[in-house]
Amino acid sequence: VYITFGVHERRDAATWAQYAEKHFGPEHPLFLGGLSMGATTVLLASALELPPSVRGVIADCGFSSPEAIMRSVLRAHVKWLPAGPLLGLMDVCTRVFAGFSIKEASTLDAVSKTKRPILFIHGTADTFVPCAMSQTAYDVCASEKQLILVDGARHGYSYLVDRPRVQAALAAFLEKYTSQEAIQ
C-alpha cells in the first residue's frame, strides 16, 4: 500500500461520500475537507461524480499536483541536485510501485471543472506547500469560492494562528452551503 498524493485517494473520498449519502440519506448535507495531502485529495475529488448531497469542499494548504509538490520540496531541500532527473526517477518509481504517475492529476484541472463551492485556506508562512499553490487554485476555480490567507501561519497551522477568523470563515461557509439546494 502506497500513499499516492491524492491521485487514488480522491476516489476513496468520492466512495465515502456515496456511502454516507446512501446510509444517512440525501437530505443530510456533506462537505469534503482536508489538510495538506487531504486538501489535495478533496480538491481532486471535487471534479469526480459526487452525490448531490456533497455541498462543498474545504481545502487547507493543498498542493497543485504530486509533481508540483515534489519539485517544490526538491528545490527547497535538495538544491545541489537538478530536480528534472529526480522527478523523472520518482515518476518511474511511482508508476512501477504505486500504480500512478506524478503527472497524472492536478488540482488546477479539477477545480477548473468543479461545480462545488470551495473554501481555500492557507498560511502565508508555509514553507512546505507554497501559499501560491492555493492562490493559483483559487484563481482558476470555476465554482463559488473563497480564499482565506492567514498571515504568519506555517504549514497546517492556519486554524491555530488565527482561530477566530478561520472559525468564522468555516461557520459562514457551512451555513451558506448547508441550506442551499443539492448540487446535481
Give the residues covered by each predicted segment:
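Catalytic histidine neighborhood in serine/cysteine hydrolases
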Residues: 139-156
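Catalytic histidine-centered segment of alpha/beta-hydrolase-like enzymes
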Residues: 153-167
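Short beta-strand/loop motif that positions the catalytic acidic residue
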Residues: 113-115, 120-122, 126
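Alpha/beta-hydrolase fold nucleophile elbow
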Residues: 24-36
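Alpha/beta-hydrolase active-site loop
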Residues: 2-24
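Acidic catalytic loop of the alpha/beta-hydrolase fold
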Residues: 124-129, 156-157
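Short alpha-helix in the alpha/beta-hydrolase fold that links the catalytic acid
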Residues: 107, 116, 130-139
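Hydrolase active-site cap/lid region
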Residues: 44-101, 109
